[in-house]
Amino acid sequence: MKYIIKENKMVLEKVNKMNLEELLNCIVCPNIVATQEDVTKAYFCFIHPNTYDNMKRKIENITSLNQHKMLFVTDMEAGAGSAIDGATRFPSMRAACEAGDENLAYLMGKAAAYEARKVGFHWTFGPCVDILGNHFSPMTSIRSASENKDDVLKYTAAYMRGLQDFGLIATLKHFPGDGYTMFDQHLTTSCNPLTKKQWDDSYGYIYQQFIHNGVKVIMAGHISLPAYDEKDSNGIYPPASLSYPLLTNLLKEKLGFEGIIISDATEMSGFCGYMNYYEACFAFFNAGGDCLLFAHPTEEFVDKMKEYIASGKLTMEVIQNRAYRMLCFLEEYVAQVNTLPENDKENFEIYANQMVDLSCKIYRDRNHILPIQLDKPLKIAHVVIACQYDFSLIEKFTKQLSSFASV
């Protein structure tokens, strides 16, 4: 069922009494970098990957310093273990697809919801619903379920159901779709090169199905879509995060999305490299966005927004509307979720191992040399470069891959 933010009279009264600084704290999602001082007034907060105990402690500390309810979020695109060191480490969305078991993708979502909420999280930036249209894409790779739109939809939808059925808010990313370019949004504004028909039949189809099935949040990527947009005064196509034609005309009006639109990180060059940082921030709201990711409500930030309001580039009505939507979203979640889902943790590791086992397969064996059998012993140095959070997962894959060779 399509998600529509519920009206809330008490929230409206609260918003109408807020000053600009208070309103801005409702429509940013700062990340914790060094101190916690500038996030204690915010209503939403991103916590970077860390250990289970450290993340739980941070959330508890911030909550104790705050006078209002908050939602905490992190990146869990394929299970909680990708962000929380100590949680079950599932492989990837690509592995979920290759395993060929839709229920395993659902159970991965269930496991993520339980383990994330146990730490104190309410929300995740996932699943990634990008299509792997270009194998040289630096952003997509195994974050994408497949090159095929139907497989992307099938397995990411199952993961989303698992997340939201057990109380963790899911977020689709990265609208209007990554995976067809060789450029990285962290470094520049990338481009989705598809024609209108190609986009409608692929990403448009995926987002339409998710909207009909209750997705609550969509992340606007720093990706342009020339097929549905026009060049700016400099002859450049803007990223979706700063485009009214893409966020309002396409996503809201054509596709009918009425949930929350959050930007990808504002510190990425695809956003702040396209135009002045503060101008980009107000342009996001004017384009139809609701919440700025990694924006911090500092004194300078507030002063800049005051300047734009005074000049007429931004209005208080827009800020109030976005604050109202975000607080309604928060209150609705808090009212619905009170208890943790059933503890099935002893089975989470089993689900993850099953996904690893099923996803390891032979794609190409032209000369029929697998499994490799050698007459003489051969010493091979197998070096894996990975962060410490991935060590246990790499060991699982290495063990499974050994079935294809005995050397």
Cite the ranges covered by each PLM segment.
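Preference for extracellular/luminal or secreted protein segments
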Residues: M1-A42, Y244, E253, Y274-V407
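Short, well-ordered alpha-helical
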Residues: K6, M10-S82, C128-R143
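Loop/turn elements at helix/coil->beta-strand transitions in domains of secreted/extracellular proteins
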Residues: L20-C26, T40-F44, N66-L71, R117-H122, ...
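Active-site mouth loops of central-metabolism enzymes
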Residues: L24-T35, M93-L107, T188-D201, S269-M275
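Hydrophobic faces of well-ordered beta-strands that scaffold small-molecule active sites
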Residues: N25-I32, Y43-I47, M70-A78, W123-P127, ...
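Second-shell residues forming the walls of enzyme active-site clefts
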Residues: D53-L65, A80-S82, E147-V318
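Glycine-rich, aromatic-flanked loop segments that form ligand/cofactor-binding clefts
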Residues: I62-R89, A105-L132, V152-G179
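Surface-exposed, active-site-proximal loop segments in enzymatic domains
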Residues: D85-E98, N134-A145, D184-S190
